[in-house]
Amino acid sequence: MSPPHSEHSNVPSDVAAGGGPKKSPPAGTQKLRAPRMRASCDGCFLAKVKCSKGKPMCQRCMTTGLACKYSPSSRSGKPKASDNGNILNGAPRHAKREGLQFSSPVFEGSQDLMAGPAQFMQNNWGSNQQAMWDLPTHQDPGTNFGSGPLNESLGQDIGIMDGISHDGGVMPFSENLADTNPWQSQNPSSSFSQMLPGSSGSMIHGRSQSTDMMISLVAANFQDTNAQAGPSHGPPLGQMAGPSHGPLGQMAVPLHGPPLGQMAGLSHGPLGQMTSPPNPAHARHHSDPAIGTGHVLSCNFDCTHQSLQRLNFMLATSSWPSDMLMTANENLCDAWRVIMRCPNCMGSGARRYMALAFLATSMQIQSRRLQAFLDTVKPNHDGVFPTVSNPAEKLNRLGTAITQIDQAYALLLRSFNNEMIEHPGVAQALANGVHKSLDAAVSLLLRKRTELAGTN
């Protein structure tokens, strides 16, 4: 008779029960656990406020009008260990963490707002201190217009920028502006926080390099500030800066224009498919005369967001017919006027940096399209222009569009300089370089138009 089974026996219970030892599934067949969703929505998480955790929309997002989205948590937890002692099918834990994808932008349906040809935005966040300027810069009117890109150099005498890559249209900053360059570090949160007086590094989501995520966070913080401080009052933006004159002494682009509801031209043409319906409060803020010019309602950052959507589409477009190019130039100026007229979108340093990026990138578009257009108006060996009808008139219209953007940019720099009292030299250097470059570009256009008129 066998002795009874002792509780201190070394025999496993499953073996004692007669079932035999349990076999683990072979390595590589174990299923990974589904990612755990974050308890708070993206907007509340980035703003560091308590979320009501409502589905499909929390109370705060419902009140502010922001998109409510729940993303996977960045804390993956401890994975289940396999039989061989390694985790996650034998791969080191740090190797798996490197492949994790973090939360997507709050604003759905928009790509990285500054994405473009050669993915220059991704290339610009590195330590090479590259920015997004790509401007027509020949200083000598006698330079051969068709011998290369329009932007060989920009204001080298003032040391603002040192060079440009001809394929991607990316221009690096010079070393003397390295300490004040807002695009100088790998992490955009540190560079933006260093440039803004009184701001903290927690303002920008440190793990995300998405401009869309940064805009979402700035908008969320702005909503919280408005809720605590109440409606703000102040003079309209059109009275903040005086009249602006371009390098050729022409009349400035007026700040005052039709309200947003009447700007139907922005929803047509090559950029129409990128528009989104405006927020009702945003449209009322721009169009209701009963509110008054000094009373500011929250526009939920729609002015800058929608304008940057159009800009993103323009950067992603490889080529346009010349007539569509003219329409795009007009839409650029119209979209910029919307941002400039909105005190909410231009009411803080972070928004002014976004507006500065908008204008710089629009100038990049202008320069690249202009160079491509000039390549099409070169005469063949018989002196005939086979691809473009009436090239002198189209060159004239291009010159007008460049001057308009230059004037709007000068207006931005005036207000930008008022904001950045600690670094006034940066805005002044930008103004000098941009004015000098665009002045030379328009002069070359006029000379080219004269040459075309003489050959026809």
UniProtKB/Swiss-Prot annotation:
SUPFAM superfamilies: Zn2/Cys6 DNA-binding domain
Compartment list: Nucleus
Pfam families in the cross-refs: Zn_clus
DNA-binding region: 41-68
GO cellular component: nucleus
Keywords, alphabetical: DNA-binding, Melanin biosynthesis, Metal-binding, Nucleus, Transcription, Transcription regulation, Zinc
CDD domains: GAL4 (cd00067)
Mutant phenotype after disruption: Does not affect the production of scytalone.
GO MF annotations in UniProt: DNA binding; DNA-binding transcription factor activity, RNA polymerase II-specific; zinc ion binding
TM ranges: none
Disordered: annotated span: 1-34, 181-206
InterPro entries attached to this UniProt entry: OAF3, Zn2-C6_fun-type_DNA-bd_sf, Zn2Cys6_DnaBD
Signal peptide interval: none
Primary role: Transcription factor that positively regulates the expression of the gene cluster that mediates the biosynthesis of dihydroxynaphthalene (DHN)-melanin, a bluish-green pigment forming a dark layer in the conidial wall that protects the conidia from UV radiations. PfmaF assists PfmaH in promoting melanin synthesis. PfmaF may function as a broad regulator promoting also other secondary metabolism as well as fungal development.
Record-given protein name: Transcription factor PfmaF
Record organism: Pestalotiopsis fici (strain W106-1 / CGMCC3.15140)
